[in-house]
Amino acid sequence: MLDILRDNPLLLLFIVAGIGYPLGRVRIGGIHLGVAAVLFVGLAFGALDPSLKLPEIVYQFGLALFVYCVGLSSGHGFLRSFRGKGVIYNLLTLGVILLAAALLLIPHYLLSLRPGETAGVFAGLLTSTPALAAAVEYLTRAGAAGQLSDPVVGYSIAYPASVLGVILAIYLAERCFRIDYRAEARTLKDVPGVSPEITCWTLRVCRPKAFGRTVRDLVAEHRLQVVFGRIRRGDHADVVSWETHLEEGDLVTAVGPVEELERAAQVIGCVSEVQADLDRSEVDMREVFVSNPEVAGRTLRELNLPNRFGAVVSRVWRGDLQLLPYADMPLELGDRVRVLSRRERQQEVAAYLGDSYRAISEIDIAVLGLGMALGIGLGLVPIPLPGGITVRLGLAGGPLIVALFLGARQRTGSLVWVLPYSANMLLRQMGLTIFLAAVGTRSGYEFAQMLTQPRGWAILGASAAIIVLLSWVMLYVGYRWLRIPMGLLTGMVAGMQTQSATLGFALDQAGNDLPTVGYAMVYPMAMVVKIVLAPVIIAVLT
């Protein structure tokens, strides 16, 4: 059987994925590994024979595909995150990484580790292959060819312990703080990846200060975060525009979170018992898929639907996430939008947005290939650092940074960079599964061999203890002191660790896309800092 698997890496890949993926759904004591279970199944198979490993190209392909898709979906939120507390979040991550380097001095001296081994444990502890490469390159430049295996050994031991340790820390934090991700998501505002619960109220204009005022003036003056849909004046109904003047007795529908609707009611009058949204005789609503490439990547402000069609977008569904539209929200391929317009213009609006389910099931391979090529190319560019060290962003950093940039831009001319939500999720999951299966089989044998030695167990135990402590410190400080939402924070922990498996677990636990925002927010800084620190550790300890 081993000979068959050795000679057929594709068979090995699908067996590891086929066993690991369903195994990750099994809950033990309320916890499940999710897609991260593929990594541990890969380790088990890799431990059986040194030649039982997937080709390097498989690992590279899965990693590049996964991080590129994560970057595309996080690009818009990544830039928005730095308008608020993004700097604080990155400083927290930086502090934890520096703490990791400091704590490694304990096992370095207690276990008499060589500098290269300590640097390898650092890279494995924070699961950074680029940092491992930087450590190996430093030893090569220093003429220490006989020590090139030291970082690799330390990395192979610490890596699996680190992944499991962080997952354990997240699980303990969820239990300790009694996290309810759904309840948490409902309370969040202006955070990419989640949306508070949205509902529709009918408001009656009965406050004198609102009489004769335009919707634009009232929204700007009171900063109302609601979408006004239709207005009923006497027996006549129409779609609300920015220039609509409100008169006494008007019935206006508004969509938004309950607390914002309460504010809107206080501004213009009161809540009406009449449900004006049920009257569809003149103004109707229709849910439409965004499938027109000419529309994708453009903001609602650019599309200017009220002036073009007399239409208003009142809700946007992206995957399972229901979003409240705002002027600078870019529409993406695969979005499902609820459009209000006069009945005679419904078909016209739908045709403009696309409304083709088949179209959003297709992927522009040319654009996908171009984007990934740009990312892989960036990862190959050598970056000189002080001390004669040259590093590269690699397959993890290059595609992610390019994808963050492209995801923020959404489109360039006729090129639509973002993928339909369903296609992005499919490619992301496939890439992550391939990556985990490959890295598990490639590390399994060395990992098993080191565990036959007491020293290997000591390094493993120290690595596990340090990463659990680091993760717990980050989770506790972030949640208790900085009041960071746990969904965002678990993604930040995965970004600090630059670990796709941890992100997969965090996504499974949260049930929304908030962890990807935290991951993308801190990943670039974390990756660069670890690349710099790995050779510095060797230089300082030599």
Swiss-Prot record:
Keywords: Cell membrane, Membrane, Repeat, Transmembrane, Transmembrane helix, Transport
Magnesium listed as a keyword: no
Keyword Repeat: yes
Recorded GO MF terms: monoatomic cation transmembrane transporter activity
Protein name (Swiss-Prot/TrEMBL): Uncharacterized transporter STH2172
Biological process according to GO: potassium ion transport
PROSITE patterns associated with the record: RCK_C
Topology of the protein relative to the lipid bilayer: Multi-pass membrane protein
Subcellular location: Cell membrane
Residue stretches making up the RCK C-terminal domain: 186-270, 273-356
GO cellular component, one term: plasma membrane
TM helices/strands, residue ranges: 4-23, 28-47, 57-79, 86-108, 151-173, 365-384, 389-408, 415-437, 457-479, 484-506, 519-541
Pfam families: Asp-Al_Ex, TrkA_C
Chief place where the protein resides: membrane
Lineage: Bacteria, Bacillati, Bacillota, Clostridia, Eubacteriales
Family: Belongs to the AAE transporter (TC 2.A.81) family.
Coiled-coil portions: none
